[in-house]
Design a protein with these regions (language model features):
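Gly/Pro-rich interdomain helix-loop hinge
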Residues: 82-90, 220-259, 267-274
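Polybasic, low-complexity association/targeting segments
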Residues: 1-26, 131-167
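Conserved phosphate/anionic-ligand binding catalytic regions in large, soluble enzymes, centered on
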Residues: 64-72, 200-215
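Acidic-glycine-rich active-site phosphate/pyrophosphate-binding loop
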Residues: 3-9, 34-54, 107-110, 175-194, ...
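A short glycine/serine-rich beta->alpha loop
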Residues: 17-25, 56-64, 118-123, 158-166, ...
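Short glycine/serine- and small hydrophobic-enriched flexible loop segments
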Residues: 36-40, 75-82, 135-139, 177-181, ...
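Ordered, small/hydrophobic-rich secondary-structure cores
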Residues: 39-110
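C-terminal binding/interaction regions
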Residues: 95-155, 250-325
Length: 325
């Protein structure tokens, strides 16, 4: 997807951009800012979603992969549609999520945080994705995107999705279940992670079990930054090359740093945080899906989800009570 040449035709919405900029000045990190901005624009009171995104800045636990300007809108598409709304053989979140990613790439040429931010100390390249993501989300939310996924890829995705449903497995939801959540008691939480399957909508990107663990860290123990002076200090420290991610600098830093520590453990155990690298399968290709199914790669995915949930639980052992939604 990231090699496709697409033209951005997004009409600017200055009210959305103004709201996003105001939130960015108070919060300082991408994923929580985008989450807060879309919640504000949608008049939704769900602060738990901001906590859920607390560890996601820097490309999911500061690993440099999917930008927070993508992951937060995908969470909110899940809240809107879950896996309940189905178009043919796939939930509509695949159509909408794919369309959202296409539009994001049209604006920013990539989904990857590290490619967007570059090597500049001051994160000036991160500002446009934060400002534009809410209007991309709103543009995608109620549209018809049934043709967004090319037919060949859609057939491959449909076969893989049927295989996972038959085996009652969803990467992100499996981690949540191991952490003590349940679809019956926490339906919105399970909806929120709908897109995080097969490395984000079967795109083979960041392992969705890992993503769910980082989200759980934020949900259970995350704090929310809301201070312009503290964000100015954060940016100043970044610009001069200091340790801007010290946990005393910004309240989101603790969750992000925990996510990064989880990433180091995950990479040691699995060799990568990237689904396609771990599985050795390209899910957009029917041959890749056949490889995954016929060689029973699912068994390893189930084991990884279980073991990673145990690691997350260890990290949060001092957090004895669940944070209510």
């Amino acid at each position: 997807m990231e090699n496709q040449s697409l033209k951005s035709e997004l009409a600017p919405n200055w009210a959305y951009r103004g709201q996003s900029f105001a939130n960015l000045l108070r919060m300082g990190h991408c994923a929580p800012t985008v989450m807060r901005s879309i919640l504000d624009i949608s008049s939704m009171e769900k602060e738990w979603l901001v906590r859920l995104s607390a560890g996601m800045p820097g490309g999911i636990g500061n690993t440099g992969y999917e930008c927070g300007g993508v992951t937060s809108p995908l969470v909110l598409l899940g809240i809107h549609d879950g896996l309940r709304q189905v178009d043919g053989d796939l939930p509509v979140i695949f159509d909408k999520g794919y369309a959202l990613c296409q539009q994001f790439i049209a604006c920013h040429q990539t989904l990857r945080c590290k490619e967007i931010r570059g090597k500049d100390r001051f994160p000036r390249h991160c500002i446009p994705p934060v400002l534009l993501s809410p209007e991309i989300f709103m543009n995608v939310l109620d549209g018809d995107h049934g043709q967004a996924i090319p037919a060949g890829e859609r057939a491959a995705y449909s076969r893989l999705y049927a295989h996972l449903v038959e085996n009652e497995f969803h990467c992100a939801q499996a981690v949540l279940i191991h952490l003590g959540y349940s679809p019956a008691e926490d339906p919105e939480l399970f909806d929120a992670v709908s897109a995080f399957i097969g490395g984000t909508l079967f795109m083979g990107k960041t392992c969705s079990a890992f993503t769910a663990g980082v989200m759980a860290v934020g949900l259970r123990a995350g704090e929310i930054e809301n201070s312009i002076p503290r964000v100015i200090r954060l940016l100043t420290i970044m610009t001069v090359g200091g340790n801007a991610f010290d946990e005393s600098i910004n309240k989101f830093n603790q969750s992000m740093n925990r996510g990064y520590r989880l990433a180091k453990w995950f990479m040691k155990e699995s060799g990568s945080t990237q689904c396609q690298v771990i599985t050795g399968c390209d899910f957009s290709d029917p041959a890749g899906v056949s490889n995954y199914i016929e060689n029973d790669r699912l068994t390893r995915c189930k084991l990884m989800a279980s073991e990673f949930a145990e690691k997350v639980q260890q990290m949060l052992a001092d957090e004895s009570q669940r944070v209510p939604l």
